[in-house]
Amino acid sequence: MTDKIKVGLIFGGNSSEYEVSIMSAHNIYEEIDTNKFDVYPMWITNDGYLADDADSRKVLDNPKMEVANPHKVANISNIIELKDRPEIDVFFPIVHGNLGEDGCLQGLFRVLDKPFVGDDVLAAAVTMDKEMTKILAQRAGVPVAKWIAVKRFEYNDPDNEKLDYEYVASQLGSDLFVKPSNQGSSVGVSHVTNEKEYKVALAEAFKYDDKVLVEETVHGTEVETAVLGNDKPIVAGVGQIINAKDSFYTYENKYDDDSTSTLEIPAKLPEGIVETVRKNALKVFQATECSGLARIDSMLRSEDNEVVLTEVNALPGFTNISMYPKLFEEIGIPYTDLITKLIDYAMERYDHKKTLLHKHD
């Protein structure tokens, strides 16, 4: 018998960030403290199947691997009663994108009555939706880029003024970003400056979501910080992204080891700006009711040095070049200890939830 905590490391999934998820899971699997935890990888294939234990371990070293006959998740109980795995004590989801970080998987864990790393259901759903994040950040006094949201029914109406580049430019300026509201890692994002580009960008973004944001372009430098904890979160230092391509931080820039973008940690910025980035991050983390972890991304606007929120990533990557673990390593929390803390915070929140009343006696 072992008294180690059994961790279900869930990764993969039917998402545009599928391979990123596998790379993150590989790193967590390699770095987790095996004196404290027994790890059981759980690979959800691109087709939505849950592979067995052997294949789930193999794919960690080969993200492009496919299986012919994976074990299908036929019902909820299969998650915790698979024949080749013991019952899991705590889940560590690293399924990026749709279903994995939008509250769906988190809701399943709540139904299973199991602790899990990362946001609870509400915060996961809110932070996945860029518009909802903006609304809550504004209420907390954190600056955000001006935006217009275009819903699917509006996009399908050829007479809707939001489809007119000239109208949108009159509200937000001619230099714009078009992005799916519920996607991460710059997937489906386009930079546009004219009518033709705008039409193409809308079509591209609507491939990924039923709501698209059109935002003013904030010229400056992308800065990021990381948050760890529940009621008394720790805010790391600030990192800065230097993009040699002189363009926005693309999906490839974020996850390609050969990317020409570099991460500067700590950022060489005035102390006042660093503290503003950190204070804003804490405000947003609490306003969106995050718990466990989040990476807060902002732009340092060049014209006035205002820190403008761009995104809350409540399930950040753990790849070789991911900013989240690097920021905590810089302040003295190494990768292995960070993983342990995340699991501890998951257990802490679960234990607290158990003290809440759910019915009136």
Curated annotation (Swiss-Prot):
Its cofactor is Mg(2+); Mn(2+). It is an enzyme of class 6 (ligase). GO terms for molecular function: ATP binding; D-alanine-D-alanine ligase activity; metal ion binding. It is found in: Cytoplasm. Pathway: Cell wall biogenesis; peptidoglycan biosynthesis. Its main location: cytoplasm. InterPro entries: ATP-grasp, ATP_grasp_subdomain_1, D-Ala_lig_Van_CS, D_ala_D_ala, Dala_Dala_lig_C, Dala_Dala_lig_N, PreATP-grasp_dom_sf. Binds 2 magnesium or manganese ions per subunit. One of its GO terms (cellular component) is cytosol. This is D-alanine--D-alanine ligase. Belongs to the D-alanine--D-alanine ligase family. GO terms for biological process: cell wall organization; peptidoglycan biosynthetic process; regulation of cell shape. Cell wall formation. Pfam families: Dala_Dala_lig_C (PF07478), Dala_Dala_lig_N (PF01820). Its EC number is 6.3.2.4. ATP binds at residues 169-224. Residues 134-344 form the ATP-grasp domain. It comes from the Bacteria. The gene is ddl. Keywords: ATP-binding, Cell shape, Cell wall biogenesis/degradation, Cytoplasm, Ligase, Magnesium, Manganese, Metal-binding, Nucleotide-binding, Peptidoglycan synthesis. It catalyses: 2 D-alanine + ATP = D-alanyl-D-alanine + ADP + phosphate + H(+). NCBIfam families: D_ala_D_alaTIGR, PRK01966.1-4.
